[in-house]
Amino acid sequence: MDPQVAFFIAQGISVITGIMAIVMMQLKSMRVILIFQILTNLFASSSYLFLDGKSGMLVSLLAVVCSVVMYFYNTKNRKPHLLVAALFIAAYVASAVYSTVTSNDPWELLPAFAATCFVLSLIQTKASYFRIFATLNPVFWLPYDLHTASYVMFIVHFGILVSSVIGMIRLDGLFRKKK
């Protein structure tokens, strides 16, 4: 495929991802948040695929699997075992190391750090705790997005960061004075 066409397709997919991700940070139900996580990560993996961001694509696909697993735990009103979280984190690190070695690009490690924050956000049972860890996730994605020329995903991740903070203020009472 022509690189310019792939670039524009990726940016278009990223716009859809961004809208969904920003809305997701304002949701109260962890179950609905997990459904949005599945969808946004499917779109994000497609975007990174078109931009040849191997690690970003792998991490996003693993995030889909992780979100599905966490969704089933949530539907049973059970907290996931820490072993499940540790396995996903190990898979993220392995995918990042693989991508880094095959591409000889240390930037490919950043998605693994973002994914660790992602897993820590998903093992939370309350949406307020989810938002705390979800706020850290874009901090690692932002430089990776610039490196892979995923400019719309950069805007998406910046929007997620801002929306997370707004959600923490609006829904979780961040900065409210205690009476």
Describe these PLM feature segments.
Residues 1-179:
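Alpha-helical membrane-protein topology signature
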